Structure formats: structure tokens, C-alpha cells
């Protein structure tokens, strides 16, 4: 118990400092110049997890998964480019339905990754904060379930559909597919933990931090209009809302299943 308390006393302030510095960097530096300091801050967060993992009650696998997500996200800016995959899918659908559908399947998973330096730099601090809270609320498999499944179903599918309806490429912001699903799920999980779970003070802090991330992301979560056009670019607001809502719902089942496992 003492080890966990000490770890949490180090964990919360250190995470908030990393997020605050990342937010400042994203605000004052051009996107590509901010990539290096953002990468350093992300690795600092991973290092923090590795050092405090026992006190936080997580294993090395959890830390490795977060590291992989960070590295793939940075690589995506230069290599994967989900928007290009979607554009290719829409083009192929007009010529070869099977090939176009294959590209769409690939895009559904690629949609979890950032499409540009601006996307990554703009959303990474919020992703780190949401992940920091999720680690305290969910086991690894539920973290992946809440982030990946809600992201693919909410943002990935809606982006494909809206791009076809609007006949233009509709984009999402950075890691928002994963972030929005996690945000909704930990909002529900921390609230339920606050009401009937142990460690209520931790759940309270997690709930308040998640409310802050919701506030910061509010302009993306309002689904009207479903596609917001800024400088000729269509932004998928409906998908962000759908992922967030899916996260809210899926957390109810995750929390119930966790409680049943603890009672057995």
C-alpha cells in the first residue's frame, strides 16, 4: 500500500508536467519542429511508467504496448499516412470494388494513427493524459479494447461513410480515434469506481482529469455538423462523438466484468 501511494504521488505530478510542457511545445513551435520535443516527452512518460510500474500495478507488457503505440504514431506521420490510404480506397472503389474494399479494411486500422505532424503534435498531450488515467482504471486488454475497437467502429467506419457521402476526403485528428474511445470509457469507469469501488480518491482524480480532457476536446465531440469544413478540409466530428459514446457504453461492460472477476 505504501509503495502504491508513493508511486501515485510521483505519477500524477510528473504526468501533468509532461502534458503541460507538451501542450506548450505544441502551441509555440511549428508542427515539425515540435516533433522531437514531443517524442522526448512521450519517451519520458514511457520511462516513468517503467520505473513506477510495480507501484501502479502494471507489467512490462503494458509499458511496451504504450511504447509501440508512440513509436508507430510518429512513424505514421512520415510512412503510413492514413489519409493517403483512404484516398486510394475511394479511388479504387470506383474501378475495382474488391481492391477498394481491401484498402478500406486496411484504413480502418490505419485510422487509429495520425495523418500529419500537426495532427500528432496537437493531440499527443491529451493522449498521454488519457492513457495515464486509463492505466489506473483498466487492465491492458481492456485498454486495447476501449481504444482500438471504439476507434475503428466510431471514427474509422464513419470516416469511410462520410467520405463517400460528401464525395471528399474526410479526416480525423491525430490519435483521436484511440483517445476519444478511451476518454469515454475512463469517464464511465472512474465515475462508477467513485460511487462503489475502493480507492475512491484515485477514481475522483481520474474522473476530474478526464472531465478536463473532455472540455479540451469539446469542439471535436459536438457532432453537428457531422463534417466541419476548415480551409477546404473536412473534419469528422460525428466519428469523434461516436467513438466517445462507444467508450462510455463499453466501459459499463468492462467494469461489470472486472467486478465479477474480483468477486469470484
Predicted segments, located by residue:
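A detector for small-residue-rich transmembrane helices and their helix-helix packing motifs
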Residues: 3-263
